[in-house]
């Protein structure tokens, strides 16, 4: 299960940024090139495990886009991207997000009360971005059928549980100076 993803993670280079061990991977960074077979493996797996009875697939700019786009193409479900810049459209919702290494503002367009979405993201670590997004969607009256993260690192997903959301993390990892270690694979019992 998810052999390409697991192999690519274990073989990811790790660099030190201050005290933080940072892994570099095509899904989280777009570096090196993203192998279409890797994207296909991930998309096929998500289709198997996620509630895809939705109006739209929702992702966050930028690195959630490749996987969400593949899902959209495979399922025929429209794709909505939460952007990092405003478009000043009617109904646009602004949200502040904070991660372990940055703060910013995101903008939701094209969603309304009663819409059903599946959220797909590349990585969850601190949970700051997804936490802000889930809160905003709940306040809008948007129904979240599932939250999917390709890669999980750390315990940030616990924050989502406080909002009644149980994310599905495909592969949970630990990163040290020695490299990336696989901790868990969703559905691998």
Swiss-Prot record:
GO terms for molecular function: guanine phosphoribosyltransferase activity; hypoxanthine phosphoribosyltransferase activity. It catalyses: IMP + diphosphate = hypoxanthine + 5-phospho-alpha-D-ribose 1-diphosphate; GMP + diphosphate = guanine + 5-phospho-alpha-D-ribose 1-diphosphate. Disruption phenotype: Cells have increased resistant to purine analogs 8-aza-2,6-diaminopurine (8-ADP) and 2-methylpurine (2MP). No change in growth rate in HS (minimal) broth. One of its GO terms (cellular component) is cytoplasm. The keyword Cytoplasm applies. PROSITE patterns: PUR_PYR_PR_TRANSFER. Its EC number is 2.4.2.8. It is found in: Cytoplasm. Pathway: Purine metabolism; IMP biosynthesis via salvage pathway; IMP from hypoxanthine: step 1/1. Coiled coil: none annotated. The keyword Magnesium does not apply. It holds the Pfam family Pribosyltran. Its main location: cytoplasm. CDD domains: PRTases_typeI (cd06223). Keywords: Cytoplasm, Glycosyltransferase, Purine salvage, Transferase. It is an enzyme of class 2 (transferase). Used for negative selection when transforming this organism. It comes from the Archaea. GO terms for biological process: IMP salvage; purine ribonucleoside salvage. Homodimer. Catalyzes a salvage reaction resulting in the formation of IMP that is energically less costly than de novo synthesis. Belongs to the purine/pyrimidine phosphoribosyltransferase family. Archaeal HPRT subfamily. This is Hypoxanthine/guanine phosphoribosyltransferase. It comes from Methanosarcina acetivorans (strain ATCC 35395 / DSM 2834 / JCM 12185 / C2A). The lineage of its organism: Archaea, Methanobacteriati, Methanobacteriota, Stenosarchaea group, Methanomicrobia. The gene is hpt.
């Amino acid at each position: 299960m998810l052999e390409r993803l697991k192999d690519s993670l274990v073989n990811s280079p790790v660099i030190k940024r201050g005290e933080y061990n940072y892994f570099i991977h095509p899904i989280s960074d777009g570096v090196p090139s993203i192998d279409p077979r890797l994207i296909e493996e991930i998309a096929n797996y998500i289709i198997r495990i996620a509630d895809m009875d939705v109006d739209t697939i929702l992702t966050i700019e930028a690195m959630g886009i490749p996987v969400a786009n593949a899902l959209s193409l495979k399922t025929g479900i429209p794709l909505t991207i939460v952007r990092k810049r405003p478009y000043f459209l009617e109904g646009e919702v602004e949200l502040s997000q904070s991660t372990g290494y940055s703060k910013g503002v995101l903008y939701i367009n094209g969603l309304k009360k009663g819409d059903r979405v599946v959220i797909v993201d590349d990585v969850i670590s601190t949970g700051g971005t997804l936490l802000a997004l889930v809160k905003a969607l709940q306040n809008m009256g948007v129904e979240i059928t599932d939250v999917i993260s390709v890669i999980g690192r750390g315990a940030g997903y616990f924050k989502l549980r406080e909002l009644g959301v149980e994310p599905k993390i495909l592969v949970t990892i630990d990163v040290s100076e020695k490299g990336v270690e696989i901790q868990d694979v969703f559905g691998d019992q």
